[in-house]
Amino acid sequence: MAKKVQAYIKLQVAAGMANPSPPVGPALGQQGVNIMEFCKAFNAKTESVEKGLPIPVVITVYADRSFTFVTKTPPAAILLKKAAGVKSGSGKPNKEKVGKVTTAQVREIAETKAADLTGADVEAMMRSIEGTARSMGLVVED
């Protein structure tokens, strides 16, 4: 028989830098999960990812206090800021442009996020990423 799910916890944790301090500790502690066990497993799984990059993670906590987790790809906005070389998006994206990204960079981001994005093909996923870029005040160039 399958284990009974007690809770789902969604967090964004910096790659390779999970530790028991907030937000990880309190979120897992409330469910009675072994925090250090999660931190070690998460850090081991995200070794190959650039350190400090926020990684969304969904933790499934079972009634017997065991857990499993699934890591996702970094948010598109973070990848776009990194590609454009800017610290933050524009406060007024329609009026003030803060940076530029090329179509090739957008394609690369779409292919990186392909596992998490819903789209018929790479072109559809690229349009989604381009929309995110525009809403951040980034210009997409050919």
Swiss-Prot record:
Return the InterPro entries for the record.
Ribosomal_uL11 (IPR000911), Ribosomal_uL11_bac-typ (IPR006519), Ribosomal_uL11_C (IPR020783), Ribosomal_uL11_C_sf (IPR036769), Ribosomal_uL11_CS (IPR020785), Ribosomal_uL11_N (IPR020784), Ribosomal_uL11_N_sf (IPR036796)
Q: Does the keyword Ribonucleoprotein apply?
A: yes
Organism lineage reads as: Bacteria, Pseudomonadati, Pseudomonadota, Gammaproteobacteria, Enterobacterales
Name recorded for this polypeptide: Large ribosomal subunit protein uL11
GO CC aspect terms: cytosolic large ribosomal subunit
Keyword line? Methylation, Ribonucleoprotein, Ribosomal protein, RNA-binding, rRNA-binding
Organism domain of life: Bacteria
Family designation: Belongs to the universal ribosomal protein uL11 family.
User: What SMART domains does the entry give?
Assistant: RL11
Q: Which HAMAP family does the annotation name? A: Ribosomal_uL11
- Entry keyword GTP-binding: no
Q: How does it assemble?
A: Part of the ribosomal stalk of the 50S ribosomal subunit. Interacts with L10 and the large rRNA to form the base of the stalk. L10 forms an elongated spine to which L12 dimers bind in a sequential fashion forming a multimeric L10(L12)X complex.
Which molecular-function annotations from GO does this UniProt entry contain?
large ribosomal subunit rRNA binding; structural constituent of ribosome
Its function, per the record, reads:
Forms part of the ribosomal stalk which helps the ribosome interact with GTP-bound translation factors.
Modification after translation, per record: One or more lysine residues are methylated.
Q: Which GO terms describe its biological process?
A: translation
